[in-house]
Amino acid sequence: MRERANVDASEGAARAATALGAGGQTSARALEGLDAAWRAMREGGKDGVDGFARRARGDAGTRGGGDETAAYDVAVCGGTLGVLVASALQRRGARVVVIERGALVGRAQEWNVSRAELESLVDAGAMTRADADECTMIEFNPIRCGFYGSKGEDVVTTNILNAGVSPERLVRRCRERFEEAGGTTLERADLRGVDVYDDAAVLNVGEGSEPIRARLVLDCMGFRSPIVRQIRGNRKPDGVCLVVGSCAEGFPEERNESADLIRTVTDIEEDYRGQYFWEAFPASSGPTDRTTYMFSYMDAEESRPTIASMLDDYWELMPKYQNIGSVDDVRMKRVLFGLFPTYRDSPLKTEFDRVLAIGDASGIQSPLSFGGLAALLRHIERITGAVEEALDCDALDRDALRE
């Protein structure tokens, strides 16, 4: 299959990431795993998790729930984006620990945001303006929108998703700022459960490690978070955005100075695939390097396509979209794919004291501009301000966190 061959070929040029989201994964094994998760959503009744977060009676200190001297104000679970919030909170005076199941590093593929959105990290205190400049690898304008069969002209705008940000630099700089301020990072920590006591939450981070005590747990583990899956149970999402794409070298340099925010090049697809939309951005890795995404919105009925089959459609349609002869005319650097489930009751309301979902875990992502970094940036000042206030007032019960 073409999709498998190209994914495998790209692995030498890209480290496989673990985050699920737009461009969040690159390996053939990750494609199989994501399609399995998507299949479980479509089939229903197979995606829930039981007992990961539990209510426990009494105080943690009297129940063997970790060493009181190691207590934190906030435990951030999921560090790739969580470290951004952690850095802001730590620099505001909270005692914060970041728990990451793998190595806390950013992926190779650039994130596209606006400079104004990136500035929100500076305003929140997560990083300096010099850090933001260092992380911005490329900027471009104009940004276009256009639709297949339309007799009108393209809609042209500027300064929307027009900055390519290096995740590797962004995560590294926020981590450095976080740790400089006294924050603690736990890498390769296997979070196995959360027990919520009257006075603290206790996090089990695997055999041979002391439990972590925190007044508040921030779940930044994405839509596949075990806490999110426990709360949502086996409920199907109300809608899903599936996305596939690649970063490739060899596009005409003279046409690689602007971007597409949204474009269509075909009518609605048959076989329950919906309407294919496209995005394209110049990449900083070279003057002929370009990232293209193809995405579609749909429900989670069993008849909907696999992500692998959408990737096959991508290989067929991308040359038409980019006005090149064949996909073989460019050299693949990374193949990208992800999905975003959406629910009518988002943002997700917590079912537990001392546990709050943020980022994609909360369901606040926007499928048009995708989730991940952009979704978090738009809310980071509100999140950090609200968490700081909740800690100051000790308003950490379920009802308070739902406000």
Where are these regions (language model features)?
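Generic enzyme active-site microenvironment
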Residues: 98, 217, 358
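Conserved acidic residues
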Residues: 72-73, 215, 353
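Helix-loop-beta segment of a Rossmann-like dinucleotide-binding subdomain
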Residues: 149-168, 290-301
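N-terminal FAD cofactor-binding segment of flavoenzymes
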Residues: 103-147
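Glycine-rich FAD pyrophosphate-binding loop
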Residues: 75, 79, 87-109
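Extreme N-terminal leader/targeting segments of oxidoreductases
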Residues: 1-73, 92
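Predominantly flavin-linked oxidoreductase catalytic cores and closely associated redox partners
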Residues: 177-322, 380
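FAD/FMN-dependent oxidoreductases across multiple families
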Residues: 284-286, 300-403
